[in-house]
Amino acid sequence: MARMIPEFSRHIDKAPPFRKTGNPELDRGRQTEKELYIFLRDLLPDNWVVRYSFEFTRRTDELIEHEADFVVVIPRCGVLVLEVKASESYGLRNGVWYFDPECRHVREGNPFSQARATRFELKRKIQDYMHKSFPGLFGSIVVFPNARRIPGENAAPSSQDPDIIMTGYDLVRDVRNRSLARHLEHTLTLFGDHDLVEIRRSAFNQKEMDAVVRFLEDNYTLEPYRAFTDTYYSHLLDQLTQEQIRLLSSL
């Protein structure tokens, strides 16, 4: 069982990210992510770490906000970002993505471009935190839990590799065969020079993994600070004193 961040072991349906809202589209997405959360938690090894819904900002010329649906930290390997798409069907025609295979309802953005952008920005953010180049492998995969490839058609768009796509059919097979960890690790090994994969894997030792996990834990604490309130009352007293001086001066 993998370590999940955050951890929702009890009453997962009542956890804020998974509560029903009454919005069918939003609730379908929440339900899908909850199901994937449980599969990742229950089927990945104990020494794997999964961060769910990691929101972060990174500043270049401006401050940009990003969110990684799932970040899987794989020991002796690296980090794999999962971009999850909850819709039941997708179509791609002439470079435009649609929500339906008949290609009538346009959706915003290319899911592979989104996964790649999140991967690049998260890698840079972690490197900023570690103050060095990322030591292991760093990859991304697009997950369509509620859809599958149409039999007899291409396994992937001609612009993409089939191994960076995971459909509901793939997930069901991995759940039944207990092969989810092997599948994700294989995908991550594709993101690197073939001759350097083993070197990069060995460089991602326990110390480096612990540093990445600390980053993903995102711990932060603020302590009590009374000076603000004290300054407020001091300000009121000063204002009152000034008012009294003005009144006395007018007598």
Predicted feature residues:
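Hydrophobic residues on short alpha-helical segments
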Residues: 248-249
